Amino acid sequence: AQGQLAKYAQIQPGVKGDTTINVLSTDVVFQADGCSRTASGTTTLTQRTISPGAVAVHEDLCMDSLSAKYTAVMLKQGLTAEKEEIPFAELYFAQKIAKVQDALGKAYWQGDTASGSANLNKFDGLDKLILAAGTAVNGNPTAITTGTGYTSGNIIGILLGMAELIPEAIAGADDLKLFVAPAQFLSYQRALADGNYFHYVSEGQTQSMPLIGFPNIEVVSDPGLTQSNNNIYLMRASNIYIGVDLPDEEANDVRSWYDPNDRIYKVTMAFRTGVNVAFPDEIVRFALV
């Protein structure tokens, strides 16, 4: 599991198939003390399901083809040696894993099993799951349109409006995150500069920064929301669950071998992963209309 979202979400290992997130909810009803008792209050156990998708990455590398594109310095001397190993393995695997992690970061938000995109149709992402739940708070009650969009002139008002709509039960939480696309984050940074809110800006804040007036809410730039439907989400980080079938130390498991029969170097990555939220009614969802 990787991408910006995975840095904040709860990682649930051992997910091989549909796996439940067990959610306990209870309330309290005070009564007058006395010699008798009457039971009151309600405790319920509800379940949300992580439905993981099986993901695989397969690639065949022909050293003959690569030798025409890379200098002799990068390729080992000798025809046989060239074929039996990747001379730039560290560079190759680092980039391959980074690309997989970036693609997962996008799928965790934009995934849709009905999508025509191979990178998005392995499991449903949060965009689809939160909308389908139908209980998230509408963060756009004034119906800002797609024609208006997000600008440095309205982004602060949009984010503050979402903060004011946050459910009372989580208003004081210390892990509240406003997930925005990088373009929206840049608009927020520009708005802070235009408004001379420089005391809210610290050096090196390229991925996240606090929301004006709400020190317990962090605005997070998430590349996984790039080229999406441009929704913005306000929720607790602890409300997000990413399911994986491998523990963290094995999450970057890569199998590679040289096949002497095909004279090809083969690479395979295979895993299961999925995502969901525990409390969709504790989310503020902003969608342009």
Whereabouts are the PLM-identified features?
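Assembly/oligomerization interface modules of large self-assembling protein complexes
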Residues: 1-74
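Sequence/fold signature of self-assembling virion shell proteins
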Residues: 1-22, 26-27, 123-153, 187-289
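Short helix/loop capping segments that flank catalytic or ligand/cofactor-binding pockets
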Residues: 69-70, 105, 187-189
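Alpha-helical scaffold segments that mediate packing/assembly in large oligomeric complexes
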Residues: 72-164, 288-289
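Short coil/turn segments at secondary-structure boundaries
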Residues: 108-114, 172-181, 201-204
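Ordered core of a single globular domain
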Residues: 149-196
